[in-house]
């Protein structure tokens, strides 16, 4: 993307001139964690980084948005069992986000937008939205490139609403962005069909439950990547960029409905 929207490319003098209270500082959140046998560890990082860059490149000038580097390590303890998963404890991640919030608050900007590429961060980041609002007076926003299936997002029919991790959607986007890192010969359907029979205790149900990704299948993914395609990934990626653009426009004029 054009370096003009990268916050780190500004000098201290330029930052003071370019940023205002209505500027949006965008922080993408990635992850380095197991994604089954067919996807790379950096899947969430690749997606969060690419979609955030594309959105800020397209809508940054209009919305006065500035991009921070993508945070690679986040709260991935549901995958702690798998070698290669690099995760921060909830306490550490809260401290990191608090520190970043403090630094943003020291600039003229008073709005921070988190673009979260890892569903396991969602609950923690929703809490930090309010903490940063209370502690630093920032306007805080949490967006997702694609809403996780266990949080109300879409899922392929073959996934029974449980394309939670490494399923058709995520695999398709990676086939679009980094096909060289995807091994479709290892893609298999892994869906905990018994949960689909439950009324309340299930992904996205009224009753949440704690889980680790290997509670279900040894491969570590939950979904059906066998139907993934680069074409679907391209359409999903473009849709995510446009959706984030709408969000950025609304954030740029947000004032609690007053």
Model-predicted regions and their roles:
Residues 1-111, 119-258:
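Extended, histidine- and acidic-residue-enriched regions that form the cofactor-binding/catalytic faces
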Residues 114:
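Conserved SAM-binding loop
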């Amino acid at each position: 993307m054009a370096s003009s929207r990268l916050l780190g490319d500004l000098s201290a003098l330029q930052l003071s001139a370019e940023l205002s209270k209505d500027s949006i500082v965008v922080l993408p959140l990635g992850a380095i964690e197991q994604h089954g046998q067919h996807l790379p560890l950096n899947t969430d990082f690749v997606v969060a980084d690419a979609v955030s860059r594309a959105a800020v490149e397209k809508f940054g000038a209009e919305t006065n948005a500035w991009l921070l580097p993508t945070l690679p390590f986040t709260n991935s303890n549901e995958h702690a069992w798998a070698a290669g998963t690099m995760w921060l404890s909830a306490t550490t991640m809260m401290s990191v986000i608090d520190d970043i919030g403090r630094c943003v608050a020291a600039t003229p900007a008073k709005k921070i937008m988190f673009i979260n590429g890892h569903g396991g961060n969602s609950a923690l980041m929703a809490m930090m939205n309010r903490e940063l609002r209370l502690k630093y007076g920032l306007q805080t926003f949490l967006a997702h490139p694609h809403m996780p299936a266990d949080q109300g997002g879409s899922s392929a029919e073959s996934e029974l609403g449980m394309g939670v991790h490494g399923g058709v959607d995520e695999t398709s986007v990676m086939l679009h962005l980094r096909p060289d890192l995807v091994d479709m010969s290892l893609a298999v359907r892994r869906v905990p069909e018994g949960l689909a029979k439950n009324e309340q205790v299930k992904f996205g149900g009224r009753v949440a439950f704690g889980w680790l990704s290997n509670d279900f299948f040894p491969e570590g993914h939950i979904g059906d990547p066998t139907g993934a395609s680069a074409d679907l990934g391209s359409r999903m990626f473009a849709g995510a960029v446009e959706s984030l653009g709408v969000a950025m426009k609304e954030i740029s004029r947000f004032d609690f409905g007053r």
